[in-house]
A protein has these predicted regions:
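Conserved donor nucleotide-binding strand/loop of the catalytic core
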Residues: 30-34, 44-80
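Short, well-formed alpha-helical segments that are part of the catalytic scaffolds
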Residues: 12-25
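A conserved acidic beta->alpha catalytic loop
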Residues: 36-45, 93
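Acceptor/aglycone-binding surface of glycosyltransferases and processive sugar-polymer synthases
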Residues: 65-80, 97-178, 182, 209-226
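Donor nucleotide-sugar binding loop of glycosyltransferases
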Residues: 12-15, 39, 70, 96
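Short beta-strand/loop segment that forms part of the nucleotide-sugar
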Residues: 7, 20, 29-39, 63-64
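Hydrophobic helical membrane-anchoring modules
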Residues: 1-3, 173-239
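Short aromatic/hydrophobic "clamp" motif used to bind/position activated sugar donors
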Residues: 86
Length: 239
């Protein structure tokens, strides 16, 4: 099996080289796909420089997203991916690239079909997740678990893995939930549940960010997630 690692990157210039150096080679072939989105710190220039520098040693692609939001960036990356297995890795490196082989082994062995990271099992580094964010994550995990009939500890972890084949099936049915999810979590989780894919969670260690600032707004994005949850409630439980 070949692997595509999709890395959405906005204002993550200081992490680009480390992401290339530390992303493991998995399966018969691994490609790294950076999707840059509306950065103000020359992330796009850094991706091009480091991508060209390391191209002899790694298979690297880079592209700029057309719209806004992580979900749009992920879909852009998927559109140019060639791997049998599609992985998402956040560019902030709060989940370390070295964790990815756990996800590869889970899907390649047939243990699961939709592999989701869980940051809420191991103790976190100090400052890795603010208290209100932690409460929000636990709330949405409970809400999504009830909606889907799945026991999910961390629905909003950015590291997610599924096969290219299943993603294409999911994308073909996307109209059921629509495309208003700017994060991509809702799209993948509910789409995978609708396809009855086997869910597996992989505990990972969540690190504090060492470069830049978070792209997440607690209240704005929390309210949007709440609206998405109620939308799913109507779709899943009452239709």
């Amino acid at each position: 099996m070949s692997v595509s690692v999709i890395i959405p990157a906005r204002n993550e210039k200081g992490n680009i080289e480390a992401l290339i150096q530390r992303t493991p080679r998995m399966g018969k072939h691994t490609e790294i796909i950076f999707v840059e989105g509306n950065s103000t710190d020359d992330t796009w220039g850094e991706i091009q420089r480091q991508g060209a520098h390391y191209q002899e040693y790694y298979h690297i692609k880079w592209v700029q997203q057309d719209g806004k939001g992580k979900g749009d960036a992920v879909r852009k990356g998927y559109s140019i991916a060639t791997g049998d297995i599609l992985m998402i890795l956040d560019a902030d490196m709060t989940v370390e690239p070295e964790e990815l082989p756990k996800f590869f082994n889970a899907i390649a062995s047939g243990k699961g079909e939709y592999i989701n990271g869980s940051r809420l099992v191991y103790p976190m580094e100090k400052q890795a997740m603010r208290f209100l964010n932690l409460l929000g994550n636990k709330f949405f995990s409970l809400a999504f678990s009830w909606l889907l009939g799945q026991n999910l500890k961390d629905t909003l972890c950015g590291t997610k893995v599924l096969s290219r084949e299943n993603y294409l099936r999911l994308a073909a049915n996307r109209a059921y939930f629509g495309e208003f999810d700017p994060f991509g979590d809702f799209d993948l989780i509910f789409g995978s549940a609708k396809l009855n894919l086997k869910f597996v969670e992989i505990p990972i260690r969540y690190r504090a960010r060492t470069y830049g600032e978070t792209n997440i707004s607690r209240f704005k994005h929390g309210w949007l997630l709440l609206r998405m949850t109620f939308f799913a409630l109507k779709k899943v439980k009452f239709t």
